[in-house]
């Protein structure tokens, strides 16, 4: 029989998927919102282009802020890369605001099961309400197949 810790049993809300406990809020006006296009069925292990558009909320993003896109480690998604525009799975990000964006992919960057993460850091300026960050997965403009 397991003994309880001095603080009692681990609360149920701390066990399992952490999504609800780490979401900063659901208010689109304050935190912004994202949309993905196109939303269509795709064949596994085929190349496509998908655009994620994030609209900044009232709180903005400062010059050290970031947004993060996470997905499950077990998937048929290719590994995103930002170094070779003609290579497979090339990813780009642009914003309508000040400064520049820096992208970082980590295969073990999130908490299970959302291990794979793409973090988009804001540098050298601020994003204000209504500014747009556009992330293109499989950007074909440099010759990538998607």
Tell what function each PLM region has.
Residues 1-146:
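Ser/Thr/Pro/Gly-rich, low-complexity intrinsically disordered stalk/linker tracts of secreted
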């Amino acid at each position: 029989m397991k003994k309880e810790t001095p603080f009692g049993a681990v609360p149920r809300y701390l066990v399992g998927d952490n999504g609800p406990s780490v979401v900063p809020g659901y208010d689109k006006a304050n935190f912004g919102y994202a949309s993905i296009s196109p939303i269509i069925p795709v064949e596994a292990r085929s190349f496509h282009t998908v655009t994620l558009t994030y609209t900044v909320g009232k709180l903005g993003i400062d010059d050290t802020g970031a947004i993060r896109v996470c997905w499950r480690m077990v998937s048929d998604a290719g590994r995103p890369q930002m170094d070779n525009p003609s290579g497979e799975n090339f990813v780009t990000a642009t914003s309508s605001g000040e400064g520049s964006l820096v992208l970082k992919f980590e295969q073990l960057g999130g908490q299970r099961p959302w291990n794979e993460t793409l973090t988009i850091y804001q540098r050298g300026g601020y994003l204000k309400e209504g500014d747009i960050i556009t992330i293109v997965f499989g950007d074909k403009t440099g010759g990538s197949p998607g």
